[in-house]
Amino acid sequence: MPTIEPIARGLVPVDSSAADLLGAPNYDEFQSDQEVWELLQQRPHSVLRVTMPHCAVPSLADILEEESPAALELAALNMQRLKAEPLVRQVSGVLWIYEIESPATARRPQIGLGGMARTSEIRTAANPAGTIIRNEGIKESKARGRAVLVEVTGCDMGTVNLAVDDDAGRLEAALRAYAGSRAPDYETRDEAGNLHRVWLELDPARQRQLQELVMAEPRAYVADGNHRSAAAAMLGVGVFQAVFFPAATMTIAPYNRLVREPARQVSDLRREIENYFEVQVVPPEDVPFQPLRTHVIGLYDGERWWRLLPRPGTFDPDDAAQDIDADIVQRLLFERVLGIGDAKDERLVFVGANRDARWLQSQVDAGNYRYAVTLPPVTMQQFVRVCLQGKLMPPKSTWFVPKIRSGLMMALL
């Protein structure tokens, strides 16, 4: 069973107006440093000055090298300034109920219980009985970069998104009842129009009731934040900030690709693709094409959109990881047709659902990229199946929405 503990020392916005000023997207939601810098110009009080300190500079020309000594020194300085500001207050021994209402999804609002999870419960080769299941390979340099930032600031801002089965619906029912019992302590709306509401719970008796519901779950799955949880383990702090969400309230959006150049010359693209896919021209009314059904893939070549359907026998449907369309595209289209065998190849650019198919098409039309590839969203059933088989998700295959907002709960270490 996974464990959730109260946050010993939390730093929170004093009210909704402060939450508006402090809140920000996570560090991995941006396509470029310029995007971060531009948002900081609009919202200089946001926690991006701490989470992306290399961009918290007067001009684009002044942007620092990420994770450089100068950037880390600036992060520590900005954290000290933040702690001294009237925008925040400290709370001790707190759990928090977190609800996100999204206008972009038809689902009911996503709701979860926030606190500290244990690094000792993460499932690894050395700890196969761990109840927090990762599903993504860890890049040590990326995790170490997050760890160093936590260390120099003395604060864990990178909340990990954990999904639990909640088959009986008891956790969701309890959280919704709680949220309906009183007004939130603060709320804020993000750039996409999502409404984030937070309730702080300090009473030990009520905390235990909620903790027991999480601890009744057999396992939790890391939906977002594999590297953030790994960073805590590297520091040896024993806990990391997390929110446990019932899986039924969660949504996965498409995670698409742009291709700069193929690694090999392809004289007849359609002919080569047809070795692995049935190829159909997308009708004008469906352009730009964003597939929503599993095993339907979109490809834009600068002239037209194609619908690609993997041929039988090109993947193993019983292998949960091979059944993910991102893996099918990587093996069959990128590797075999375009010669790009490594998903980390700089010719590939991964684009989350905060950019739509029209934007991808515009990038190809502008000559910035050769191809755009659109993938259907992974289903929660596919995601859980990969976890239960002990497999790893293909790189950049799940884009959970709406995203947890940085700056609404900060755990001081």
Where are these regions (language model features)?
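Surface-exposed, charge/polar-rich loops and edge strands
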Residues: 1-413
